[in-house]
């Protein structure tokens, strides 16, 4: 059951420095003897905060609690990319955080303007009088609105951020403070909800006391944010497995700058002579974090190969720095393809039940990007059957058949799709399949048979008499 109890201390910390809003939530929740929720809270909105904690207590008179509810506005729910939670176990130096399951709550209402609820499922229910510590992280994409919507090459980018001075919570909040920290001191304006104070790049709301459940005090902050808003509108990753020793990966990108649209003409001379001022919010390169031991790396677009790329490798990773043919300003698009090979023995293994499985990283290799629509296609060797995927979050899945050179029946392809993907989705996933090694001989035998057939036909041709007149 959820807490029919109270939230005692909340801390919300939000990173506003890029296109992705990162929210670190700190709570202290406890049950009252009468069963009504009460809480105290502190909220910090920042680009770089220490690890947040959430203290949860259960009063001796309450029943066991198995979950904690998180509330989101309908707008936040639309832009919600990922929600993660951990639970602290142990004390002081021996303290460790155990991951918890987070899922949409069945208590969520269908009313269009009602809060959407998520449940953090506790690994072990809280007995009356017990307490625990939680850490919650969630991310919002496309939540920063450029204003003005169009800027020239020499102007800085300003954005709106909308939120609440108090945490939206299904619990009674006894006390709460909100801190909003911007990436720079240039804050054009911010909503005042007394008591409100500002110190440099930080705005403090509160302390607020005795907030009822689902309280909401809207605030609007207008500030400078010149971080490039790199948005991958569509990414298709194709992973082809060959049991002859290689994995070939092809990634097709449709990239755009999602910030304030560029107006006027573009001057390359001004862009190169005044790099710190001209095009401050544009970007001319991206960094792709690839697996170690990559080989045969290429980077090209619809025109051809692009030579402006740099690959740095070590035993743990490979960094590919790529530069489009032109710098990207707000509203500009580009398409390109990245391809590379991987050694089979590093990523394909055999399980204890005899099945093969590939272990790769899900998500987008490009750092600091948002992917609106991601498709991962895992092309299994011909003859594979009974594929099964293991992904630590919800994805759309279907099977299709792909054909390559010398294929007869085609290759089973596992297609995984997910929207609103961020860097935290770059976690390992597995695809299991059954494969008989005898199928590895199918294509070589076809080649050998074709060559033999050609020679037999050629020899037969040499022994045939095709002349019209018989020799005497």
What are these regions (language model features)?
Residues 1-472:
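Lumenal/extracellular ectodomains and adaptor appendage modules
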């Amino acid at each position: 059951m959820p807490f029919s109890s109270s939230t005692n201390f909340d801390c919300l910390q939000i990173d506003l420095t890029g296109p992705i809003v990162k929210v670190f939530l700190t709570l202290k929740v406890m049950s009252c003897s009468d069963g009504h929720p009460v809480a105290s809270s502190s909220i910090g909105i920042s680009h770089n905060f220490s690890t947040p904690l959430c203290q949860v207590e259960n009063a001796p008179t309450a029943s066991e609690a198995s979950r904690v509810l998180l509330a989101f506005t309908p707008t936040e729910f639309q832009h919600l990319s990922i929600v993660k939670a951990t639970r602290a176990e142990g004390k002081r130096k021996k303290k460790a955080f155990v991951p918890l399951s987070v899922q949409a709550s069945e208590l969520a209402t269908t009313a269009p303007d009602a809060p959407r609820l998520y449940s953090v499922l506790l690994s072990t229910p809280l007995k009356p009088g017990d307490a625990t510590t939680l850490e919650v992280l969630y991310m919002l994409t496309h939540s920063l609105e450029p204003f003005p919507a169009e800027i020239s090459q020499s102007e800085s980018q300003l954005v709106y951020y909308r939120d609440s001075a108090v945490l939206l919570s299904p619990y009674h909040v006894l006390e709460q403070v909100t801190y909003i920290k911007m990436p720079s001191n240039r804050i054009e304006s911010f909503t005042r909800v007394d008591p409100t104070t500002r110190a440099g790049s930080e705005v403090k709301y509160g302390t607020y006391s005795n907030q009822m459940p689902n309280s909401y005090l809207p605030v609007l902050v207008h500030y400078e944010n010149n971080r490039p808003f790199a948005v991958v509108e569509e990414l298709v990753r194709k992973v082809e497995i060959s049991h002859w020793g290689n994995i070939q990966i092809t990634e097709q990108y449709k990239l755009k700058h999602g910030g304030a649209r560029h107006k006027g003409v573009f001057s390359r001379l001004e862009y190169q002579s005044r790099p710190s001022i001209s095009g401050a919010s544009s970007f001319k390169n991206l960094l792709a974090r690839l697996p170690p031991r990559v080989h045969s790396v290429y980077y090209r677009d619809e025109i051809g190969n692009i030579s402006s790329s740099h690959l740095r490798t070590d035993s743990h990773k490979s960094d590919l720095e790529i530069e489009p043919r032109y710098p990207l300003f707000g509203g500009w698009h580009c398409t390109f393809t990245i391809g590379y090979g991987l050694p089979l023995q590093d990523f394909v293994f055999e399980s204890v039940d005899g099945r093969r499985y590939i272990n790769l990283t899900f998500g987008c290799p490009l750092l600091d990007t948002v992917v609106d629509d991601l498709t991962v296609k895992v092309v299994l060797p011909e003859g594979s059957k009974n594929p099964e995927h293991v992904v630590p979050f919800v994805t759309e899945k279907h099977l299709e058949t792909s054909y390559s050179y010398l294929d007869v029946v085609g290759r089973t392809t596992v297609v995984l799709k997910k929207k609103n993907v961020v860097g935290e989705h770059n976690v390992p996933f597995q695809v299991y399949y059954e494969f008989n090694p005898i199928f590895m001989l199918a294509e070589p035998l076809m080649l050998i048979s074709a060559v033999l057939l050609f020679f037999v036909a050629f020899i037969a041709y040499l022994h045939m008499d095709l002349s019209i007149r018989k020799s005497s």
